[in-house]
């Protein structure tokens, strides 16, 4: 399996203007890496993080198909998985060459993954996974469900660490350039929530256009990234650079 854990591969989060490129973001060699493993006429599956947002999901499926074709990737189909067909389509996962795990709210997406049995469905599957934002976070064995919605940081019963898909042992935090100064429940997201939660753990905060790539023989950060561990943060990779994690 080849796992691309991205922040946003189609433009900057919270940006008002269109991205300065067509298709997928070519920064940090992501398109070249995708092409390295891409099969001609790939069958692609988009698994939504909003299982009941049917109209939004249908539009998203159309957008992804267009974006992949604009990138020059050969696509036979771009199918959609949401609550209308979840169990049925994951039982046929072996038909697909590439799976996209969409962005959204981490716990909501995780509950849907559990509902459709996605973790088990990935067993023995050998294709390309592209996680986007929450989809990248949920790839981990133990997911850090960083508080983001009102009430989550203040709620002592909110589960900040949950069982994920088990595709990696890396915890990715997306959109660092956009969220680093955010507040949740009156607390600074990074300094007062995330840094304390990193005690005894390691998180990698990445900016949009950056990603983590894990294959059978490689585990790399591509682009701007920051290592958060034991309450401290430091930059470990810059745009255009590669950091091997093993």
Name each model feature, range by range.
Residues 1-40, 58, 62, 145, ...:
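C-terminal and late-domain segments of enzyme folds
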Residues 11, 53, 106-107, 136-138, ...:
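Glycine-rich nucleotide phosphate-binding loop and flanking beta-alpha elements
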Residues 41, 96, 125-126, 168:
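Short, well-ordered alpha-helix to beta-strand connector turns
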Residues 44, 99, 133, 172, ...:
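A residue-level signal for conserved active-site and pocket-lining positions in enzyme catalytic cores
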Residues 45-108:
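Portal/gating segments that form or line small-molecule/metal binding sites
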Residues 92, 115-127:
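Catalytic-core regions built around general acid/base machinery
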Residues 100-102, 123-142:
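Catalytic nucleophile loop
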Residues 106-115, 182:
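Glycine/threonine-rich flexible loop motifs
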């Amino acid at each position: 399996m080849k796992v691309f854990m991205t922040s946003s591969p189609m433009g900057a989060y919270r940006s008002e203007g269109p991205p300065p490129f067509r298709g997928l973001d070519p920064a940090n060699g992501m398109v070249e890496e995708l092409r390295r493993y891409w099969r001609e006429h790939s069958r692609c599956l988009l698994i939504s993080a909003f299982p009941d947002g049917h109209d939004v999901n249908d539009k998203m499926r159309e957008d992804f198909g267009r974006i992949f074709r604009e990138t020059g990737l050969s696509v036979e189909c771009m199918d959609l998985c949401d609550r209308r067909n979840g169990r049925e389509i994951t039982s046929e996962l072996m038909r697909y060459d590439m799976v996209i795990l969409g962005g959204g709210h981490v716990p909501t997406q995780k509950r849907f993954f559990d509902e459709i049995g996605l973790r088990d469905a990935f067993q023995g599957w050998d294709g390309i996974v592209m996680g986007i934002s929450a989809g990248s976070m949920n790839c981990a064995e133990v997911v850090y469900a960083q508080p983001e919605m009102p009430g989550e940081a203040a709620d002592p019963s909110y589960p900040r660490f949950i069982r994920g898909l088990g595709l990696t042992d890396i915890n990715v935090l997306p959109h660092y350039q956009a969220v680093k100064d955010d507040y949740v429940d009156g607390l600074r997201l990074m300094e007062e929530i995330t840094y304390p939660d990193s005690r005894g753990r390691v998180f990698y905060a990445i900016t949009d256009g950056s990603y983590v790539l894990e294959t059978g023989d490689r585990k790399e950060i591509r682009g701007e990234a920051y290592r958060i561990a034991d309450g401290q943060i430091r930059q470990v990779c810059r745009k255009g650079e590669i950091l091997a994690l093993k």
